Amino acid sequence: MIFISPPFGNYLSIRNTVSIKGSYTLEPRSGLIMQILNTLRYSFKYYGWINKIGLKNPGIDYAIKNYDNKSIISIAILNKDEIPKLLEKIPRNMNLEINVSCPNLEQKMIENNIHKFINNERKWCIIKVSPYCTTKKLDEYYKYGFRQFHCSNTIPTKNGGLSGSSIIPHSTLLVAHLKNRYPNSVVIGGGGIKTKKEIDIYKKCGADYFSISTLCFHPILFYKFYKSVIKPGNF
């Protein structure tokens, strides 16, 4: 299965894929379109896209109102005080991806409580980690009760989050660690996927599923990927 990560998951619905909506915060953070236009740049130095979207979004109430429990909603928790409020708002059967990989987040303040989102009513309760996540931290997330992992988000730089092939060496190490140590974990491998070749790299490391996002910036490359991978289910 191919997952389409935000922001493209908000707009695309394609057979043989699952779109992840978001990321949503407790309160609205306006200015998404302008932030994309102002900060999205291609880096020829790193061969990838850099953005500083900064979690601009219409807020979790919008997601709850507009998406059913078949969707996967990505949430970002900015501080520990938001956790009980989000738990109260979000339906227990709404599928979630908890994004703990953005530099905006007070990670140390929230990670001791994020396991509260796990319950038997959710088919998906994924934790999305940074490329710089340590194996020790992955072990802690597993100990908290997480069994679904998304490796990984963009690489943090001074100019924003870097996507593209630079992520692959980091993500594959995380995928391999999880599948070697915790065979029952479900792992989505993502970052730098453009062709079947990258799919095979992640699959060799043990990834169960795969994710794309910035590939969608390239209509021609995305169409080729769709024709050769997504449409025939070649993954």
PLM regions and their residue ranges:
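Catalytic cores of alpha/beta
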Residues: S13-R15, I83-I90, Y132-Y144, A176-Y182, ...
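Glycine-rich phosphate-binding active-site loops on the catalytic face of alpha/beta enzymes
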Residues: K21-R29, L96-C102, Q148-K158, I193, ...
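Surface-exposed amphipathic alpha-helices with a cationic face
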Residues: I64-D68, H115-R122, Y142, V175-P183, ...
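Short beta-strand/loop segments at the ligand-binding rim of alpha/beta enzyme cores
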Residues: M1-I4, N69-S74, E121-C133, L178-G190
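N-terminal capping/small domains of soluble enzymes
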Residues: M1-S71, A76-L78
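Glycine/Thr-rich beta-alpha phosphate-binding loop at enzyme active sites
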Residues: V100-I110, P131, K136-S185, P219-F225
